Amino acid sequence: MSVRARRIVSGRSETVAANYAFDPLHDDKIIRNRLLTRTTTTRGEPPLKKLQKKFTSFVIELDKEEDNYSECGRLAKAFLQELSAFEIPLLKSQVVVAANLREKENFNELKDETNRQIMQAQADIEDLKKQLEESKIERQQKEECEAIRKLISAQPPRSETQKVIHELKKEIAELEAENTASWRLLELRKKQFALLLHVVDELQETMEDEQKSMVEEMQRNITADGAEAMSID
């Protein structure tokens, strides 16, 4: 409901409340009290009391056993005039009561419509709350997607990535080839070193054998020389 419609409904509600100020259950009591206390002038008697006096005077005159038709007619006319004057406020009160009843019906209709609009507004508020929550979730998802998109945009193109990967694979292959060659060379060096150690061992054994032979030969020579010297003596 728009702001203008709310103002119209509010103004209409205030008007109804102002025109229908009394509960319907108290209407009869209020009207009866007004009939008993209403005055036609500022300092005059209540209409009901005046009507009662006119009626009493007319009845008293009727009860007289005299030729008083003219007086009875005058009193009857005065009573009818007073009755007519008394009836006018009654008619006005009936009009007011009818107007109040119409206003009451209008007020009830307006109340029902206002309650319906309040319920509709509450339902709309709940729907808006749900939409707001969904909008928050959607906005959060959009922000996350935007962050991912920026992160992806900051990365190099796929072609460059593939090129880098290809270069890395090539370097890895070259390193593997170098590693294989180094391993083979290391194995060769191991074998050569083992052979060298074997040769050294053989040379050492040969040298030891030669030294041993030389020592034995020297000992034999010394022994032979000693024996020869003794024989000469």
UniProtKB/Swiss-Prot annotation:
The keyword Heme does not apply. Residues 101-221 form a coiled coil. Keywords: Coiled coil, mRNA processing, mRNA splicing, mRNA transport, Nucleus, RNA-binding, Transport. Pfam families: THOC7 (PF05615). One of its GO terms (biological process) is mRNA transport. One of its GO terms (cellular component) is THO complex. GO terms for molecular function: RNA binding. It is found in: Nucleus. InterPro entries: THOC7/Mft1. It comes from the Eukaryota. Component of the THO complex, which is composed of THO1, THO2, THO3, THO5, THO6 and THO7. Belongs to the THOC7 family. Acts as a component of the THO subcomplex of the TREX complex which is thought to couple mRNA transcription, processing and nuclear export. This is THO complex subunit 7A. It comes from Arabidopsis thaliana (Mouse-ear cress). The lineage of its organism: Eukaryota, Viridiplantae, Streptophyta, Embryophyta, Tracheophyta. The gene is THO7A.
